[in-house]
Every structure is written in C-alpha cells, then in structure tokens.
UniProtKB/Swiss-Prot annotation:
This is Chaperone protein DnaJ. Residues 219-242 are annotated as: Disordered. The J domain is necessary and sufficient to stimulate DnaK ATPase activity. Zinc center 1 plays an important role in the autonomous, DnaK-independent chaperone activity of DnaJ. Zinc center 2 is essential for interaction with DnaK and for DnaJ activity. Belongs to the DnaJ family. The gene is dnaJ.
Length: 377
C-alpha cells in the first residue's frame, strides 16, 4: 500500500501543534497495536505507518525537512521515512516501558527488506502544456539501491548473519525491578540480522542518496490537483527491499489571458464603445489559434459569448469544453475637444429618448427613487 502523507496518517492538519500530534499518535497506537490485533496483519502495517509518521512529525528538525521536501527530506538512518518500521523509542516516551511488557510488543522484529518510502514531486506546468500534454524532465533527490553491495548492506563476498544478541528476534528482554521489559535489540536495531562486515559505500544501509533525472509523460487535459504515479521510482528499500513509488502532483500556472474551470476556458474581451452600440466583428485568441467573434449591436458589458469546442478535452476522456468570452465595454479616454462635443451631442440626443435608450440605467434610477420615497427622503 502506498505510503500516505504523514499528516494524513495521523489525521492532523499541517499546522497541528506538538500536543495534537502526540494525542493523535497515542490514540492510533492504542487502536492498531499488533498485540491488540493478532489476526490482522493490516493493523500491524498501519501501526508501523503511524509510528513512522510520529517519529518524523514529533522531531522539529525532521518535521521542517519533511514540510519542505516531503519524504525525500528525511534521512531514513535517523529514524524517519524509508520504511524502517519502528524502533520503540518514542513509544516508550509516550506510554512508558511498562506498556511494552503489557502488550509484549515493545521491540517487535522489523526484519530486513523494508519497502522504500513513496516520494512526492510538485510539477508546475503552463496552461498550454497542461491542455496539450508534454514530457517533463524532473530531478528527484532520493535513495537508490547501492550498486556495490546490491542492496544487502554487506561487503562484497559476505552476507548478513543472524544477530548473535537477539538470535534473530529483533528484540531483547530486560529486567527492571518487578517488570520484564522487551526492547529493540541494540545490536541489529530490530532487524534480527547483523552485518559484521558492512559495505564500504552504503555503510550497511543497502542504499545511497542520489539525484535521479526522470522523464515524465504528462497526458493532455491535466489540471491542478491531478496526480501521476510512477511505480518503483520512489526511495529504494532498505536491505534490498522493494522501492516505493513517486507521485507527481500537477500545478498549473496562472495564464495572462485564460482562466480554466473544468473543461471550459474563460477570457475577458474589451470592446470599444462604437462596437458595443453598432455591432461588429472581433478576433479573439484560443489555445490553438484565433476565431472571429460576431458582436451584435447593443451589446452590454458582461455579456457572455460561447465558442464551442475551444476549451479543454478532459484527461479522463469526453468532448472538449468551450471558450466563454465575457465582453467589457471600454470607456473612451484622452478625448480631444471635438470628441467631447460629439459625446455631449450624443448624450443630449439620447436623453431625449428617455428610458428607451438606457432601460437598465432608468430602471435602476426608478428603483432608487422608490427606495428613497419609502424612507421619506
């Protein structure tokens, strides 16, 4: 199962306080603890995910790195991300070592071959790229399988052996007064295996940090919020485990002319005062050329004209949307004396027609007059 966002795993917002994060972890840890769900392997995996999320979000430095870079910003060798299971440290901090004895799970073996973390990459596209589709080159800082040891973590010619301290159990029991407490094995860190001669390149982790360059095919019609999954392109697993996935999250830049609403595109078209009065033709842009828009006489500001099929074809199939052009009548500026005189003559002529020439303006003025009459003004 693909790893969730750590905040989603704990069910808290990104601005959650340390106290809220701790409370969420306590609640979920009690709910999914393996010893309370012995016949439910999914609960154990869920518990590991909850613990891993808490390990990162409860540490200010790790949380800051995660907020900036996602899973790629967390160093798995420090306990956050990378599918390392759980170590039990923060668990003891919250519930106390007695909790491990009560449930018998305070140092459960993690095993080698842990799946790598999923990664998130935010890709910003132009509207043209999003509508037509494109191929993007991205650089992703991540963990890759160590080529020197092939992911085993052991030096060439050697292999991991059963841990001599815990005998492969991943945990040891310690006596604390009247209580017998189970803790993570300090030798193998819960894996149950010990590397006596670690790889000189990855120092026993089975993977190394590297920046990968990937080519991502973006299908036509994507929009902000869409997500593309690249299977196996996440972080390499620990100890030869399978890699995680890479999720490319799409964001579309603001366009200087068009705005998008689903499959439809919108634009604002300024028209001159004479064109609004008398009508005319106007060239308007589309994403694949231009079309001629016929403006009828007596067009008012805000009128919407629809150009069918000039919108966006949805990424999941279907017919293309439309281009909707909203006209805005532009008031003439920087008039000379002759033009001002002509406008005044036109105004006098129009006033003679009363509400016939300006029905909206006269209707509004009549409404205002009635409003004032009701107020006695």
């Amino acid at each position: 199962m693909a790893k969730e966002d750590y905040y989603e795993t704990l069910g808290v917002p990104r601005n959650a306080s340390d106290s809220d994060i701790k409370k969420a972890f306590r609640r979920l840890a009690m709910k999914y603890h393996p010893d309370r769900n012995k016949d439910n392997p999914e609960a154990e995996e869920r518990f590991k995910s909850v613990k891993e999320a808490y390990d990162v979000l409860s540490d200010p430095k790790k949380r800051s790195a995660y907020d900036q870079f996602g899973h790629a910003g967390i160093d798995p060798s420090m306990g956050g991300g990378g599918g390392f299971g759980f170590t039990g440290d923060s668990f003891s901090d919250i519930f106390g070592d007695v909790f491990g004895d009560i449930f018998g799970g305070g140092g459960r073996r993690r095993g080698r071959g842990q799946r790598g973390s999923d990664l998130r990459y935010n890709l910003e596209l132009t509207l043209e790229e999003a509508v037509a589709g494109t191929e993007a080159k991205i650089k992703v800082p991540t963990w890759v399988t160590c080529t020197e040891c092939g992911g085993s973590g052991a030096k060439k010619g050697s292999a991991p052996v059963t841990c001599p301290t815990c005998h492969g159990q991943g945990a040891v029991r310690m006596q604390q007064g009247f209580f017998s407490v189970q803790q993570t094995c300090p030798t193998c860190r819960g894996t149950g295996q010990h590397i006596s001669d670690p790889c000189r390149v990855c120092y026993g982790q089975g993977r190394v940090q590297e920046t990968k360059t990937l080519s991502v095919k973006i299908p036509p019609g994507v929009d902000t919020g869409d997500r593309i999954r690249l299977s196996g392109e996440g972080e390499a697993g620990e100890g030869g485990g399978p890699p995680g996935d890479l999720y490319v999250h799409i964001g579309v830049k603001q366009h200087p002319i068009f705005t998008r609403d689903g499959a439809d595109l919108y634009c604002e078209v300024p028209i001159g005062f004479p064109t609004a009065c008398l009508g005319g033709e106007l060239e308007v842009p589309t994403l694949d050329g231009k079309v001629v828009l016929k403006i009828p006489a007596e067009t008012q500001t805000g009128r919407l004209f629809r150009v069918r099929g000039k919108g966006v074809k949805p990424v999941r199939g279907g017919v293309a949307g439309d281009l909707l052009c909203r006209v805005r009548v532009e008031t003439p500026v920087h008039l000379n004396k002759e033009q001002i005189d002509l406008i005044r003559q036109l105004d006098e002529s129009l006033r003679g027609g009363g509400s016939h020439h300006s029905p909206q303006a006269h209707g509004w003025l009549d409404g205002v007059k009635q409003f004032f009459d009701r107020l006695g003004l």
